[in-house]
Amino acid sequence: MTSRPKARLVAVLGALVLASSHTAPAAAQQAPKRLLFLTHAGLYKHSSLGPAEAAVTAWGRDAGFEVTALQGYVQEAPSLDLSMVTAEYLAGFDGVMMMTNGNLPMSPAQRQALVDFVRNGGGLVGVHNAALTFYDFPEFGEVLGGYFRRAIRQRHLFVLRVEDREHPATRMLGPSWPIVDELYQYGTAPWGADRPEENVDVLFGNRIPMGFSRDRVRVLMSIDTELTDLDGLEEIVRGGDYPQSWVREYGRGRSFYTSLGHRDDIWSNDPVFRAHVVGGIRWALGLEDGDATPRGAR
């Protein structure tokens, strides 16, 4: 639980970087886009799944999309039934949002249908623990952009460097965004038998099948190691590269990812975070334009 003084500090600083009180431009007079929200706790159950589902459902009413939530978080992982999520079912949606970890109970054909859905023009929105999903299906990682390797301390005040201030997911921000949340570090190379302890998810032992690369995605935000207090943060070093949000195009589709969203309360009391997530969703759904061209090494 974040301490009240630190939470107030972040709220004040966040207000300074929020350029508009609106989460998105008024939706055009057209049928709302349809977003399927998948939650699943195959490895670890985040308490933020319920608040996230409720928040995104509400936000969509004013942002041009409607949410179908399967409420996977209320079921024990072994009993979750996703047998209906087929290519035909996905055809009824414009995008899929995922706060999931581990292997969802989906057949190889269903997994491939999800990837093909994006390749053929659908949108994918991955939030926080989505990067711990389908370690044994590298094509999912190709769509999302990378896989989780380790968590960076919770309840720490990080300063994020905003690398793209024109994209719908970040244009509400100034050059820096101070925020308290759990951030992630991503695998930079695939696991190899000659390096059995490298490129492995340090929490659950999953072998990372592909490495994150700035040559593949357009990074929107990364940890500013000059402005962030690194005292006690053994996971990162000053001058290191720690992307936390990015976008990419995959075939005719779009993929947006953010590491943020671990905290329950961030889904209800942070207008900057709301604008960030809604902007990313709208971009992934094709409601707004934004450059996804990779810019290579920082």
Language-model features, listed with the residues they occupy:
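A glycine-rich, often tryptophan-bearing local segment used as a flexible ligand/cofactor-contacting loop or short
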Residues: N103-P178
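N-terminal secretory signal peptides that target proteins for export/translocation
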Residues: M1-K6
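Signal peptide processing junction and immediate N-terminal pro/mature segment
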Residues: H22-A28
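Catalytic beta-strand/loop cores that center a nucleophilic Ser/Cys/Thr
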Residues: E66, Q154-G251
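Helical hinge/lid and interdomain linker segments adjacent to catalytic or ligand-binding clefts
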Residues: R34-L38, L43-F134, W267
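Extracellular/periplasmic catalytic domains that process cell-envelope and extracellular macromolecules
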Residues: Q29-P32, R61, E88-G92, V118-N120, ...
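Extracellular ligand-binding/catalytic regions of CAZymes and related secreted enzymes
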Residues: Q29-K33, T39, S47-G50, A54-D62, ...
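Bacterial N-terminal signal peptides
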Residues: V10-S21
